[in-house]
Each structure stands twice: as C-alpha cells, then as structure tokens.
Amino acid sequence: MTLRDYYLHILKVSKVTRCKYHKINAKLDKLSSMDRYHSIRKLIAEHADENKARQMAQYMRHRFRFHGLPAAGRKRCYQDFLRQERRNGCIDWPLLDECWQDEYREMQYFVSDYLLALKSFLTFTDIPKIEAYVRGKQWLDTIDSLCKIIGYVGLNDSRTNLLMLQWSLDSDILVRRAAIEHQLGRKGQTNTELLASIIVNNFGSNECFINKAIGWALRDFSRTNPAWVRNFLQIHQTSMHKMSCREAGKYL
C-alpha cells in the first residue's frame, strides 16, 4: 500500500475526527497535482449512488457521466481539503485542469467549488484559465457557477469590464450568458452602465438561455435598485424579449 493509498483508506472511515482530517489533508498537500487529482477522484467515487447518477445524467440530457452525489454530500467530501488550500494560499491549476478533463461531472463541480473557495487569490491574469473552463465541457450548471468567480475578479480589476463586453458579443451563447450573469449578487456594487451595455448587446436574440439570463440579471438587481430596473424596462421594453421582461419584473 502506497502512502497515498494509506491516507485514502483513512478517509473512508466514517467516524474519522476533524483532527485526523486535518492531518490527512496536510499529507495530501505534499502530493503531486496528479496524485491529488486521483485522491479527490477516488474520494468522490467512493460515495457514488448509481440510481441518482442515472437521474442526474438524464436531467442533464446525458451530456455527462455522474457519480450521483448531491451538492451537499459532494462538498462534504472535500471541504477540509479546500480549507487547507485556503491556508496554503496558492491555486493548484494543474490539479484543476486534470479535474476539468475528467469524464465525471462532479469533478467539474469540484473545480468550481475550489475556485469559489479560493476566489480571493484570483487575479485578472487568471481569467484566461477560467475561460478555458467556460468554453470547455460547458453547460448551464458550470456557466452559472464560473460567472460568479469572474464577477468577483471584476470587482477588484476594472479590466474585466472590457472583457465582459467582448464576451457579450461572442458567437458562443453560453459565453454571452456568463457575461450577462457575472454581476449577479453584487447588489450596491453593480456597475449599471456595464450591465445595461451587456444586456443591450444581446437584444434581438431568440435564445432561451440568453433571454432568461437577461431577465435574471435584471430581477436580481431589482432587489437593490427597483427604480433603475423599472426605468430600464420602460426605455427598452419594445426591444426586449417577452421572457426577459417577465423574469425581470417578478419583484417589481
């Protein structure tokens, strides 16, 4: 049994104490990125549920394979690992790249959770790496998560604004969706000029994923500034898709 296998064996013990988890993660921290990838992969696979996996794959139109872990259970598998990574203060991009290429969707969810947990260590120069995840193995689930990470970077570096304007005109509709949604949750920190420009760039689209996103972005901001959203709808109502208007006005 290798050292890595030994620690994985310990991880399988259901009543392992938090102290032991910390010791295990400290040891895993010393492994190579590839070994860490295999460790995380095995840890998630050990909690697989075939029935739920089939249901999840069907819900996602069989685009991806699943182990069948719900979000809460999946996150419990590696919460201590992410806590240790935050202490380290360094993002393991080779690990994330391996996870993103994995055939099981939970591994892409791990990447999103990892980046959200370590978002304070991200800079504008990391966005090309995140963009590779936005464009690869893409679907609504990962797009709607990764856009929040990009939005956080944008709060600290205004260069992100121009990039999001470029994304809002991209030929890939899911890249455009990420641009539309990247300010979700910003509340009073929302850049309204940027929000308006990105939305206007997507007027005339018949894509459900785009029009829903426009409505959600406006609806989210209406919680903070309903007057701004009402005014926007009044000005642009004739140019907006009915779906966008309906979603945007739900809280008004």
What positions do the PLM features span?
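Acidic, Ala/Val/Gly-enriched low-complexity intrinsically disordered segments
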Residues: 5, 13-16, 26-29
